[in-house]
Amino acid sequence: MSMQDPIADMLTRIRNGQAASKVAVSMPSSKLKVAIAKVLKEEGYITGYSVAGDVKPELEIELKYFQGKPVVELIQRVSRPGLRIYKRTTDLPKVMGGLGVAIVSTSKGVMTDRAARKASMGGEIICYVA
């Protein structure tokens, strides 16, 4: 049986990996997952990521901790296969009053809510991270 929501699975693996104090988590790779991992690394929520394998590529995400506690406090799926959530530039949410980020899929690629606002672009709200 196929996976219904691979992005939710990715976020759950990150959440569970940090709850279990794992160094890294791995999952099947896709272009969207790699783009989300890139944004998480740029924002400082993960240490790094790598893609290995040709036939079935695996994405490995290195989790980040600060003084023994996970850096990611909140990672929550917003838009899902059964209910897509799209917002225009003026309606993009601020996560935790601007302390967190909303990851947005736009026509120019996957970016944070701040970058989307700066570029005057709306799009699909993939998830919240704080």
From Swiss-Prot:
Protein name: Small ribosomal subunit protein uS8
Keyword rRNA-binding part of the UniProt annotation: yes
Record keyword Endoplasmic reticulum present: no
One GO BP: translation
InterPro entries (UniProt xref): Ribosomal_uS8, Ribosomal_uS8_CS, Ribosomal_uS8_sf
Function: One of the primary rRNA binding proteins, it binds directly to 16S rRNA central domain where it helps coordinate assembly of the platform of the 30S subunit.
Species name: Aeromonas hydrophila subsp. hydrophila (strain ATCC 7966 / DSM 30187 / BCRC 13018 / CCUG 14551 / JCM 1027 / KCTC 2358 / NCIMB 9240 / NCTC 8049)
Coiled-coil residue spans: none
